[in-house]
A protein has these predicted regions:
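C-terminal catalytic/motor cores of large multi-domain enzyme assemblies
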Residues: 1-215
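Single conserved hydrophobic/aromatic residue that forms the stacking wall/gate
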Residues: 214, 219-223
Length: 223
């Protein structure tokens, strides 16, 4: 087994055996977001600007952490109930590489614009695949996003990246008929799977968190 996979296997096993995982599944209506992305263009050249949906999700998730700070924490001592509240917003991105799974961080997402986040996502993904990324980029995260959108599938149970307390799984978006104002409309929906540490996050808080995240996704306020 390659070294990266050995390290990942050990870390994932520890997380699964340590944290009581619960996964909350939902779907977000991203019709407006996809329409907005399709219309993005350079104001000077008029050329289309391609921004991955993951950049919007990372930004929306950061807003979520501000509203629900428990998700931006770590449980340091179970017996004493010591919880460390993080003051930064570093989003981990699970990257599938030929060497195994890597989770580099996009740091200070709250201070960056969508375009910056999108460019940084491409950069850290490429560095990870080429084994050129600094090891320090794998530590100090707030929460992790893992996306299977480019591969397929809908809902799954992502394993929390310990010592974080939650991870957001993203499936492949698809068209769905939704009944809105007395008629069915074709909408684009995104499957969401949020795994969380049930020792410090309860089901109601997780449900509120997911609802808030997908409510902020379709708006331009996060740009």
């Amino acid at each position: 087994m390659p070294r990266v996979k050995r390290l990942a296997a050990s870390h994932l096993s520890n997380s699964w055996n340590t944290i009581p995982h619960v996964t909350h599944h939902d779907e977000a209506d991203i019709t407006e977001l996809e329409d907005f992305r399709a219309k993005l263009s350079d104001p000077v050249s008029g050329d289309k600007i391609k921004i991955t949906p993951l950049a919007f999700i990372a930004k929306a998730l950061t807003n979520n952490l501000k509203k629900f700070p428990t998700f931006n924490s770590s449980l340091d001592n179970i017996s004493e109930g010591k919880i460390t509240q993080k003051k930064y917003f570093h989003i981990g991105i699970a990257v599938d590489t030929p060497h195994g799974l890597m989770v580099p961080k996009i740091r200070n997402v709250d201070q960056k614009k969508i375009k910056e986040i999108s460019e940084e996502l491409k950069n850290v993904s490429e560095l990870s695949r080429n084994l050129k990324i600094d090891k320090k980029e794998f530590f100090g995260g707030s929460i992790t996003i893992t996306s299977l959108g480019g591969i397929g599938g809908t809902y799954f149970t992502p394993i929390i990246n310990y010592p974080e307390v939650a991870i957001l799984g993203i499936g492949r978006s698809y068209k769905k008929q939704i009944f809105i104002k007395d008629k069915f409309l074709a909408r684009t929906v995104l499957p969401i799977s949020l795994s969380y540490d049930h020792r410090i996050i309860d089901g109601a808080e997780a449900a509120k968190s997911v609802s808030y995240t997908h409510l902020t996704l379709p708006t331009k306020r996060i740009v």
